[in-house]
Amino acid sequence: MNKLKIGILFGGSSREREVSFAGGRTVYDNLDKTLFEPIPLFVDSFGNLLILDWQFIYKGSIRDFYPPSEFLPESTRGFQIYAENLGSLTHQEQIRLTMKLGTRIEFAQLPDVIDFAFLCLHGSDGEDGRIQGMLEYYRIPYSGSGILSSAIGMNKVIQKELMKKSGFNVPEVTVINRSEWLASSNRKSFIKNLKSVGFPCVVKAANQGSSIGISVLKNNDVDAFIHAVNKSLFICEISRTEWNSMTFDAKTEWIKKVSDIREGIGLPAKINNRTIYHPEELLGVLIQLFGEMEDIVSIAAMEAETEVIIESFITGKEFSCIVITMESR
């Protein structure tokens, strides 16, 4: 009996790539090998695709093998990085990063490589309808929601509006636009938008996963509110007083946290009009700016969020279900 070739797409460029990587490994391990042939299809930071050699599947995180150690710049503080932290790479430079990790393929080759796509990709390019549209173009069946439902599910603002119009019970919601927030000279004034929502409330990015950039506000603490909105927009602000109060080791740990896509804003990021790619570079720039007596430095992730959604806190028990549609329907 010919085994069904299951392409497990995992990794990707989103903030949730580590969750995706771990999920892909779980699927790879648990597929019934008597019926299926699992093919690990790793999507790198730039959207390139390769059949990943099996030994890399069992690394603790993506940063443990990609980018490969020979491409890593020297770091006196032991910073771990993702491939995009190497700078603005040409396509050929991107290819060189993956040459020793597996077999590089094009998405157009997938119909000849797999029979079914098991999608473990998270966030942008994974759950927003893009990969789904491409797979449908190549007539490859895949797991999960279709194009439209994926796109709607990814944008929480549109999702809430459609649910409300369809008669579903939804919590009270207010939305803050990034451009309006950045242009305002009085961000404290935005807290008046929370009157209809009440407290406690949840502040989260409109186009990210359910665990990314989220804060819970218990009361109308203005400073906590501003911090929560900045967090959801992936903006970090630090004052000279805060910076100078830290030891050098504490500054290093702060840089590591801010540079981490899972708990910080991630890099590359912008300070004024300068693009910062590497944590070591960020450390040096902050030392320079605060040495020049800058009062507050704002660091904004290049992978920006356009909207922040604030909604009433829901109490209850979460649940999920899987709906399987028969081929005939």
Where are these regions (language model features)?
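Active-site nucleotide/adenylate-binding loops and adjacent lid/helix of ATP-dependent enzymes
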Residues: N2-L9, S14, A22, F107, ...
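Short, flexible active-site-adjacent loop segments at beta-strand->alpha-helix junctions, enriched
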Residues: H122-G123, N207, E327
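C-terminal active-site-proximal or functional interface alpha/beta core segments in diverse enzymes
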Residues: E318
